[in-house]
Amino acid sequence: MTTMNISTLRLDSNPITTSTKSTTHRSGALGYNGSYSCRLLQFQKKNKAPSIIVCSTKPLASVVEHQGVNDSGLTRIESLSQVSGVLGCQWGDEGKGKLVDILAKHFDIVARCQGGANAGHTIYNSEGKKFALHLVPSGILNEETICVIGNGVVVHLPGLFKEIDNLESNGVSCQGRILVSDRAHLLFDFHQEVDGLREAELAKSFIGTTKRGIGPCYSSKVIRNGIRVSDLRHMDTFPQQLDLLLSDAASRFQGFNYGRDMLKEEVERYKKFAERLEPFITDTVHFMNDAISQKKKILVEGGQATMLDIDFGTYPFVTSSSPSAGGICTGLGIAPRVVGDLVGVVKAYTTRVGSGPFPTEIMGKGGDLLRFAGQEFGTTTGRPRRCGWLDIVALRFCCQINGFASLNLTKLDVLSDLSEIQLGVTYRHPDGSTLNSFPSDIRLLEQIKVEYEVMPGWQSDISSVRKYSDLPKAAREYVERIEELVGVPVHYIGVGPGRDALIYK
């Protein structure tokens, strides 16, 4: 197998920026002369429509004003509103958990509002111990923080208890600190089995589910035969509810074998689960609104990301909930007027797990190189993530939907060895006309041409940098160009996986 050194990559000679099929140079020699040379490349990516790379001019001074910069970040964090949120701006895996973990010590409550165990957040404690959380909010490592699992979350109890056991065995106290909504729906093992059966049925239009049972559980919720956490308090009627749910699955999927022994075993399991869960069960709607009245500070931790939103994402290659701003209110039972600052988390490049449109994807060895440099493998599934350049069109769309007050740009350090970096700034129809917004039509997304700006890399290690002014000039220009293109300031910049590897801007 041929090895590649990321530090030797150049736009004109490596698969991270050129086609494996053909490349046609349109405007002379490639390369920088200190003032951003103009050039035009046209290349094919597998069977996709050709993408276009245009010259970038010298970055203008950002139209975004930056005020109140504090090296410690304390002023920046404490200025966040009473109810703030951290949401993903891409297709998930942006690094939301790290920011939530850092912010949590300044908030009384951290809450999950949607999704389930398909949301994988990796965080590290002060000793560098790694925790992969799927249901428990990332604020759990901060001893004084209360963690809420809201009504919009679907809860797999075996998975939840496994996370709690792992945390407590590593010295993290969970008793009295995790509150589970009595309105949250229960996700059963059979939901996971059904998820796999349904995926097999749809093999020709493979969506790429995590097979965690999220879709089937939300389906049960919507058709109104789901079972909620509060139902565990009524074990006299629980068997009938579960029988209805299992019978429905058996009638729908021939491969699902359901018998009375299964029902009996599940009922006995859930009697024990109910007893263990009881101390955690809470009317979280009342709890949250009471906390707001008491001026408690609340941080909402979004799962997945806006581009996976059931309404606004690349449907049907999406999740089954609303991981955008609207999901905060419906998933926690709080009023829109109380929601304040929302921070959007976005990688310095783009990744996606599973199938679906990905306009700025880098194909071949170039994508592999970026994947290994960024260790892009799913927290939940372990699957390799598809990698590509930062998609400004999609990011701007996410900023419009969510009304972000600021952005957290993560993994800037992963790009450190590249000689040149690209930003996907414009989508064009196959006929060359410009798309004015992010399209809902996935067929069109597969055909569009992406117009890129090319910027110089900084080719130096920035993982130890903690002040924005100490970043290389090219790195600062990259950050400021993103701000200029989307109209939202970048307040946090990730330069490594550790808690301290964060620049406050």
Swiss-Prot record:
Keyword Chloroplast: yes
Cofactor binding comment, as recorded: Binds 1 Mg(2+) ion per subunit.
Binding site for Mg(2+): D93, G120
SUPFAM superfamilies: P-loop containing nucleoside triphosphate hydrolases
Protein name: Adenylosuccinate synthetase, chloroplastic
Biological classification of the source: Eukaryota, Viridiplantae, Streptophyta, Embryophyta, Tracheophyta
Gene: PURA
Transit peptide: 1-60
GO biological process assignments: 'de novo' AMP biosynthetic process; IMP metabolic process
